């Protein structure tokens, strides 16, 4: 599936989910091991982070709810990084410049990765943005969130606390 087709689907379906209350689900299935790019252009595989609790968030500069969720996820990262949380914000912009402009306006400490071809959201079954996946230390997707509203922060904190306490 080409990136333009994925973006068309996300633009059509995404706003419906993104502006309403977020949808949360609890599941347990292995995380797809897809390759993404670092800011320097190096390739990393998501499985490289196995052994940590991971929050993977798919976002784009044009996604209105992402402008609110991105800083909130950075706060979560700062609050839980010493307990083993890694936040991976996977940008899906086709033009890297668009992401760079967004990132300059939103200082952050979380890890930003890039997937302009849209392989990783397809592997995760992303249906709207932002979409987040909480992964346990064994590499299993345990919780998913589609969309974003401020009231979801308590859910994130509860789920992260649960996962970081598991050994």
Protein language model annotation of sequence segments:
Residues 1-6:
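Positively charged n-region of N-terminal signal peptides that target proteins for export
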Residues 47-63:
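Short active-site neighborhood of thiol/selenol oxidoreductases, capturing the structured segment around
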Residues 85-96, 108-117:
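Thiol-based oxidoreductase modules, predominantly thioredoxin-like and allied folds used
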Residues 21-47:
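N-terminal "domain-start" segment that seeds a small globular fold
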Residues 58-75:
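Conserved redox-active cysteine motifs that mediate thiol-disulfide chemistry
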Residues 8-18:
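Bacterial N-terminal signal peptides
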Residues 55-57, 87-89, 133-134:
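Hydrophobic beta-strand core positions in alpha/beta domains
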Residues 101-109, 116-161:
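Thiol/disulfide oxidoreductase modules built on the thioredoxin-like
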